[in-house]
Amino acid sequence: MLRRVTLKETWEVAKNIKAFRFDEKLDFTPGQFIMVWLPGVNEKPFSLADKDLIVVKRVGPFTSKLFTLEEGDYLWIRGPYGNGFKEVKGKVALVAGGIGIPPIYALAKHGKLEEKVLIYGARGKDELALLDIENYVDEIVITTDDGSYGIKGFPTDVLAKRKEEFSQVYACGPEIMLAKVLEIMNYERTQISAERYMKCGIGICGSCALGPYLVCRDGPVFTGEQLKDTEFGKFTRLPDGRIKGLR
């Protein structure tokens, strides 16, 4: 059921990326999402970065409208929905690419993991968000495509060199990056936060189909084994149902 929340604060965390904190603390598992409704605009899913926080990149009409909201304005939300990350013992890698950082941030902050290594990449220094995540991990490795901060390259470059260290890899980011993570790990010891176009968020409409799964109901977090024989990393579906290749 939709419920109204009030924005307590909003702030810019990186280039074209904004944080929105609201006045309700949600009981959630890192990796779960909420549906956010703006009257007269649309409704969209966002992974929770914290109990009362979403972090959003401006990419279209909905997020552009969201960016105009300020402290004291209202949002309408429902959820949390979906299946989140399952915690595994040992040293783990948290791999984030671009705006894939929010659920990884939530896992770093709230997960009771033994040893956490964050591998986080963005196009450039100005697109790195939520860097206070360093307070919740044991090691942080930053990569940028242009070399403006940290190591020049991609998170998967780092993972490929260190994959044997980790009992589990948790990842969220662009699908091409996630497909590479699965390839590096041979679809083993991985939990991936997947994205598909989503309408209902509760497993009714089928818009977010991914192989035999519905992302909203069965995900958004999947194991590598679940994704191995699906189209993940090969093609996705547009809002009108058309297939779009990813490579």
Curated annotation (Swiss-Prot):
Keywords: 2Fe-2S, Electron transport, FAD, Flavoprotein, Iron, Iron-sulfur, Metal-binding, Pyrimidine biosynthesis, Transport. Pathway: Pyrimidine metabolism; UMP biosynthesis via de novo pathway; orotate from (S)-dihydroorotate (NAD(+) route): step 1/1. The keyword Metal-binding applies. [2Fe-2S] cluster binds at C200, C205, C208, C216. It holds the Pfam family DHODB_Fe-S_bind. Its cofactor is [2Fe-2S] cluster; FAD. One of its GO terms (molecular function) is electron transfer activity. It comes from the Archaea. SUPFAM superfamilies: Ferredoxin reductase-like, C-terminal NADP-linked domain, Riboflavin synthase domain-like. Residues 1-87 form the FAD-binding FR-type domain. GO terms for biological process: 'de novo' UMP biosynthetic process. Binds 1 [2Fe-2S] cluster per subunit. The keyword DNA damage does not apply. Heterotetramer of 2 PyrK and 2 PyrD type B subunits. PANTHER family: DIHYDROOROTATE DEHYDROGENASE B (NAD(+)), ELECTRON TRANSFER SUBUNIT, DIHYDROOROTATE DEHYDROGENASE B (NAD(+)), ELECTRON TRANSFER SUBUNIT-RELATED. Responsible for channeling the electrons from the oxidation of dihydroorotate from the FMN redox center in the PyrD type B subunit to the ultimate electron acceptor NAD(+). Belongs to the PyrK family. This is Probable dihydroorotate dehydrogenase B (NAD(+)), electron transfer subunit. It comes from Pyrococcus horikoshii (strain ATCC 700860 / DSM 12428 / JCM 9974 / NBRC 100139 / OT-3). The gene is pyrK.
